[in-house]
């Protein structure tokens, strides 16, 4: 098999954040003042901010959210529609924005913030409806720092941190996964909102639990992984797990469909239908997702 490069777009960002969704990519310079929105083949828009960028996200319909250091506030959130017009803005007086996500219909934003009070850190998550100035929902998580917010189907929201795995439905009903014995180590959310979560069993670096959920937040299956997990990825049909020596792929019932030996320098895996790609420092290797055959593979080096 061969892998064909679709496009190559240069940037000079020193700390790039890349956020892809439904064929569009938001590339932001974290700590800088510029961002780009791109299709598979070209740059659609390049914007600048007055203050330093700290986080960013893009929704399925092209709505983009940029979080920056604040102007007369601790941090600011600005939301643009697909025509690059500002449709919502919010000033966070006392806290730093950590993570953002946009709902599929482009009408809601979820924001994780971190602040300090009496010398103690605290974290909370807010849900904004762009029809209103203030948050329509708010959830406090105490000292558990929330590193990820992801909208699933409709307004169903996944909230994650090292010791947090919560699903919010109807903007108010929060359901918490019990992580008293385990901690969250890896998470992947597909374009169609399937969730794959890797937990460290009893905090172990080598004993893992793979939990997979559908876009309604319902658990599909659980599998034990007896190796350290470097990366996990899922699409609408398969879930792939990268360890130090293997790439293991499962179907949506938890059945193993393929297992490949990989080199130890793999950094991340990415499932995309027929192939699962493994990124390393020098190359990208493609493996058959549904077969153990080593004949149906491809490699792209950094200079190709």
Residue ranges and their predicted role:
Residues 205, 210-304:
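Hydrophilic extracytoplasmic domains
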Residues 11-22, 51-60, 94-103, 141-154, ...:
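Repeated scaffold domains used in trafficking and secretory/extracellular systems
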Residues 25, 63-65, 106-109, 156-157, ...:
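Hydrophobic beta-strand positions that form the internal "hydrophobic ladder"
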Residues 28, 66-68, 111-112, 159-161, ...:
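Residue-level marker for isolated small/hydroxyl-bearing positions within beta-strands
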């Amino acid at each position: 098999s061969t892998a064909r490069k679709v496009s190559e777009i240069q940037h000079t960002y020193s700390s790039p954040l890349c956020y892809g969704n439904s064929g569009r990519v938001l590339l932001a310079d974290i700590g800088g003042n510029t961002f780009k929105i791109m299709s598979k083949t070209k740059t659609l828009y390049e914007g600048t901010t007055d203050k330093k960028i700290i986080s960013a996200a893009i929704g399925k319909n092209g709505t983009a959210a940029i979080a920056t250091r604040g102007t007369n506030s601790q941090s600011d959130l600005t939301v643009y529609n697909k025509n690059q017009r500002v449709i919502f803005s919010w000033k966070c007086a006392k806290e730093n924005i950590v993570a953002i996500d946009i709902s599929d219909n482009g009408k809601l934003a979820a924001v994780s913030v971190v602040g300090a009070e009496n010398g103690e850190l605290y974290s909370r998550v807010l849900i904004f409806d762009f029809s209103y100035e203030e948050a329509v929902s708010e959830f406090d998580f105490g000292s558990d720092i929330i590193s990820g917010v992801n909208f699933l189907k409709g307004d169903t929201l996944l909230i994650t941190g090292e010791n947090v795995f919560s699903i919010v439905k109807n903007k108010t009903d929060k359901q918490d996964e019990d992580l008293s014995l385990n901690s969250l180590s890896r998470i992947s959310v597909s374009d169609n909102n399937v969730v794959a979560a890797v937990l460290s069993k009893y905090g172990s670096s080598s004993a893992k639990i793979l939990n997979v959920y559908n876009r309604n937040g319902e658990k599909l299956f659980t599998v034990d992984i007896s190796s350290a997990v470097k990366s996990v990825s899922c699409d609408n049909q398969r879930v792939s797990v990268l360890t130090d020596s293997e790439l293991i792929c499962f179907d949506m019932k938890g059945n193993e469909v393929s297992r490949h030996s990989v080199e130890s320098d793999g950094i991340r895996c990415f499932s995309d239908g027929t192939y699962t790609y493994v990124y390393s420092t020098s190359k990208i290797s493609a493996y058959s997702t549904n077969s153990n055959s080593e004949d149906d593979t491809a490699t792209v080096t950094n200079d190709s």
